[in-house]
């Protein structure tokens, strides 16, 4: 794999040898190293990478990052010694393919992205109201009817549908290939079959397993739907166990995600079968029916030597300590679960939802809500071990995960834009025990843009850091400077509201002054990268307070 990467990225060909030689790169397997730890030593005439199998892979990734992206035939790396191991055992990224189907080739590319930066888990969100994406051979109706929708809501405005058929699914053969591809890159794939809510695609194929009997169609817009699985229908459990049995054959992961989020109970309140089950089990509230369902599915998975994971609503289902809780509605669910002795994966909306805007919604591609903004600096500031988790329970925080929900991410190019550079920040907080300053992080991380350019990967060009200093003499003058962390990048700006790409002045590290006496002033700037790639227009308004 290392030789292939060097050939593809640098047009360098290396020969393999079983003996140590000068001017060679040696990978030495040593099981005494920590599970994913490694040692990388660069000498004048030799490079040594030591570790177990996973550690060797991560040592290789570090070595590749040390090679300048612009390097040609003569590659030079200064001598150094690195001893490294991860902070968290679970370092993940989730991709929602339920809203939009991404090709098997792109799924492999996504795995390349995360593995290159030492993430080791791909949470594959395979089913949704908007699409069923996994072939189940016993029930071909699931993909025949559930994998396709008539159109898609493409904007938050009412009635903004494209009326274009959309869909797709992964065959079991494709899934096996992807699982094997990931394993070679030290990535475990955790499949998610979301239930008992977010199941309109399934109910389109099996309306009799709902409380009303349907008919249904695969969802064309976004939001929480009232129609969910009928918990009181015994036939439901046979279908769910059949589906999971095929899923377990495809995915060797010890963890299986069953969703469990956003499950309305309105239909259960009016359903004779659900009310009968409620009475039979001695339950008092419809919400407890979800607990019955989750515990029953958990027992089935345990019988197959698998462990259940669910979104943090599952914590309310009186589940056993073996269930992993994924905290998403803020951090409170994860804090509570860890203090109870549950293993926890932290992925709160406030830090780890990478479908959220990266900057000003006015100049960014459309996102889920104008109120939802998670810039790069906020991602980097996150600490998955919240201070409200008691010290003795810190060990229950398995790790951290970034989530890519795709309601408005309709293309691979836009998905790449949402991935980078926030993936760099996620990778660092997941791996590194110590934390750098944000400026230090940017100086290191932004060097990776050369690699993305070289491999034709899209990314968001970050805005400059603006250092402002208001006048203290009552003159209402605002002075500011701008900093950027990419060698050769250029900043163009205006302070009169005009387009900086057309009319902007090139910033030369000078102090820029704004007189705010006459009302609000607008700073607009763009960044032009050495590759020629240009940022969105960054807009900041200033006024006298």
Show the residue positions of the predicted features.
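Aromatic- and acidic-residue-enriched carbohydrate-binding clefts of CAZyme catalytic domains
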Residues: 130-184, 199-238, 266-286
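A conserved hydrophobic secondary-structure block that centers on an alpha-helix together
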Residues: 96-129
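Contiguous, structured surface segment used for ligand recognition
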Residues: 1-88, 414, 430-451, 455
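Short, compositionally stereotyped local motifs that mark structural "simplifiers"
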Residues: 436-545
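Flexible, acidic glycine-rich loops studded with aromatic residues
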Residues: 307-323, 329-481
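Active-site neighborhood of glycoside hydrolase catalytic domains
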Residues: 207, 219-220, 224-322, 328-336
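Conserved, mostly hydrophobic/aromatic
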Residues: 52, 93, 114, 189, ...
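Structural preference for beta-strand elements that scaffold enzyme active sites
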Residues: 90-94, 121-123, 186-190, 228, ...
């Amino acid at each position: 794999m290392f030789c292939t990467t060097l050939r593809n990225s640098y047009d360098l060909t290396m020969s393999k040898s079983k003996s140590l030689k000068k001017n060679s790169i040696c990978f030495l397997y040593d099981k005494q190293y920590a599970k994913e730890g490694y040692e990388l030593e660069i000498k004048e005439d030799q490079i040594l990478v030591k570790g177990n199998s996973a550690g060797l892979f991560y040592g290789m990734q570090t070595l590749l990052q040390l090679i300048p992206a612009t390097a040609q035939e003569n590659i030079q790396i200064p001598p150094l010694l690195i001893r490294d191991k991860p902070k968290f055992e679970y370092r993940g990224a989730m991709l929602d393919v339920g809203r939009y189907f991404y090709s098997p080739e792109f799924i492999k590319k996504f795995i390349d992205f995360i593995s290159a930066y030492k993430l080791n888990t791909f949470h594959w969100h395979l089913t949704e109201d908007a699409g069923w994406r996994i072939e189940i051979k016993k029930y071909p109706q699931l993909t025949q009817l559930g994998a396709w929708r008539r159109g898609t809501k493409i904007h938050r405005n009412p009635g903004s549908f494209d009326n274009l058929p959309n869909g797709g699914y992964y065959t079991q053969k494709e899934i096996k290939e992807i699982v094997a591809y990931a394993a070679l890159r030290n990535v475990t794939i955790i499949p998610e079959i979301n239930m008992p809510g977010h199941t309109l695609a399934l109910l389109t194929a099996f309306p009799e397993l709902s409380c009303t009997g349907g008919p249904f169609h695969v969802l064309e817009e976004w939001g929480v739907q009232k129609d969910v699985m009928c918990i009181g229908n015994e036939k439901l459990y046979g279908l769910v166990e059949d589906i999971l049995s095929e899923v377990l054959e495809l995915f060797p992961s010890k963890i299986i995600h069953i969703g469990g989020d956003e499950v309305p109970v309105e239909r259960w309140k009016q359903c004779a079968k659900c009310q009968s089950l409620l009475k039979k089990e001695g339950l008092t509230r419809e919400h407890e029916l979800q607990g019955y369902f989750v515990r029953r599915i958990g027992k089935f998975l345990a019988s197959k030597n698998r462990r259940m994971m669910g979104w943090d609503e599952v914590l309310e289902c009186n589940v056993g300590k073996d269930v992993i809780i994924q905290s998403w509605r803020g951090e409170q669910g994860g804090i509570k679960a860890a203090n109870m002795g549950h293993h926890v994966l932290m992925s709160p909306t406030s830090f780890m939802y990478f479908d959220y805007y990266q900057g000003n919604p006015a100049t960014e591609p459309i996102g889920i809500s104008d109120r939802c903004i998670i810039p790069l600096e906020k991602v980097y500031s996150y600490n998955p071990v919240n201070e409200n988790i008691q010290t003795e329970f810190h060990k229950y925080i398995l790790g951290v995960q970034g989530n890519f929900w795709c309601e408005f991410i309709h293309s691979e190019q836009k998905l790449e834009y949402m991935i980078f550079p926030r993936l760099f920040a996620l990778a660092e907080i997941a791996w590194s025990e110590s934390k750098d300053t944000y400026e230090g992080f940017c100086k290191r991380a932004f060097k990776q843009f050369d690699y993305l350019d070289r491999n034709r990967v899209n990314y968001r060009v970050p805005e400059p850091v603006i250092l402002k200093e208001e006048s203290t003499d009552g003159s209402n003058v605002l002075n500011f400077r701008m900093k950027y962390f990419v060698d050769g990048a250029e900043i163009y700006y205006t302070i009169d509201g005009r387009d900086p790409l057309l009319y902007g002045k090139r910033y030369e590290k000078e102090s820029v002054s704004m007189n705010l006496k006459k009302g609000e002033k607008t700073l607009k700037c763009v960044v032009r990268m050495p590759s020629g790639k240009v940022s969105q227009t960054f807009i900041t308004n200033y006024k006298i307070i």
